[in-house]
């Protein structure tokens, strides 16, 4: 019953039809293993971000359709994934589909490095070794791995990169 109530609430708040709201709720609940009794956090998260950023709940939901499973696979939460989508949408004003696809690609590449650090990953058609990515990030003071050699959470790495973004130039 909670899921139905939250889905109806999402449809009303986001201006979505019931089918789209059901799909949006199902994607989030399944990908992030949210209990049915906790489904309200999906509506609350999307609504709070829509109020704070120049993005609608339906845009977040649409981008989440592309991104949710990849994000959950690298340990991201509903909240952090939604926040990344919101900031990217506000900053670029790209469509939800484009934001979802872009974030999914970035997250998937990180997941590939985490799963097989010795293998090459495809970056814009070029095969790149993990150590090149690691070296590039280390040159600006960011480590992909923690002190024990384990991969850090994706959102922690990205937040650290974001904090240094304005200091980067074409030579960095």
Regions found by a protein language model. Name each.
Residues 1-172:
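Amphipathic alpha-helical interface segments used for oligomerization, scaffolding
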């Amino acid at each position: 019953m909670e899921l139905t109530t939250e889905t109806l609430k999402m449809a009303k708040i986001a201006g979505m039809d019931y089918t789209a709201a059901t799909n949006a709720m199902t994607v989030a609940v399944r990908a992030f293993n949210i209990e049915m009794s906790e489904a309200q956090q999906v509506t609350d998260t999307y609504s709070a971000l829509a109020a704070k950023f120049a993005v609608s709940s339906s845009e977040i939901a649409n981008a989440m359709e592309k991104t949710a499973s990849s994000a959950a696979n690298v340990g991201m939460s509903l909240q952090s994934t939604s926040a990344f989508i919101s900031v990217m949408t506000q900053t670029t004003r790209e469509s939800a589909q484009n934001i979802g696809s872009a974030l999914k690609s970035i997250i998937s590449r990180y997941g590939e490095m985490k799963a097989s650090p010795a293998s090459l990953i495809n970056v814009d058609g070029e095969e790149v070794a993990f150590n090149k990515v690691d070296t590039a990030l280390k040159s600006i003071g960011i480590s992909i791995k923690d002190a024990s050699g384990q991969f850090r959470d994706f959102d922690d790495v990205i937040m650290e990169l974001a904090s240094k973004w304005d200091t980067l130039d074409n030579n960095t």
